[in-house]
Amino acid sequence: NRTPQLYYGTEVLMNGTKEVTDGNVRKDFPGGFAGDKHNCFTKEGRTDAEEAMFNWTSQLLHWRQGNDVIAKGSQTQFIPYKGVYVIARQYGGKSVMTIINGKRSDNELDVKRYAEIIGTHTTARDVITGATVDLTKNIHLTQRQSLIIEF
């Protein structure tokens, strides 16, 4: 398992693996070049799926910008457990947990495993949707879901 990261193009679902070649990860961004039929530089040029990912990434990066917990916080990485990978950051009495279900099936986050981070908190906020997340019971995760919560 590796630390999750964004490459350029992630925001429009570009993908490539180093198994093919290292250059496969560095494909030209679609659009802006002579002969490009697909233009991801504009909303009109993106597919619905690319637009959804673009909006999700934009929202995540704007939330991250100026966030002291992310910029200055201490980090704890937990050993993946039953396909779930968790990274926590803490700063100034606030916490952020990034939760990733690596499985291609639904899964659960066992909240008791993360008591040292959660402490006495009973709820958290999903940073993307704003929804309240109940920390008193296991958290249901859909296949390959990533969830970022703050409390």
List PLM regions with ranges.
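Residue-level marker of intrinsically disordered, low-complexity segments enriched
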Residues: D68, K82, K94, R125-D126, ...
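Solvent-exposed beta-hairpin/edge-strand motifs
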Residues: Y114-G130
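A residue-level signal for conserved active-site and pocket-lining positions in enzyme catalytic cores
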Residues: L60, A124, R144
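Short, surface-exposed, polar/charged, turn-prone segments marking secondary-structure boundaries
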Residues: F33-K37, A124-I128, F151
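C-terminal beta-strand-rich structural cap/linker in extracellular carbohydrate-active enzymes
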Residues: D134-F151
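Loop/helix patches that line or flank the sugar-binding groove of alpha-linked glycan CAZymes
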Residues: N1-I118, L141
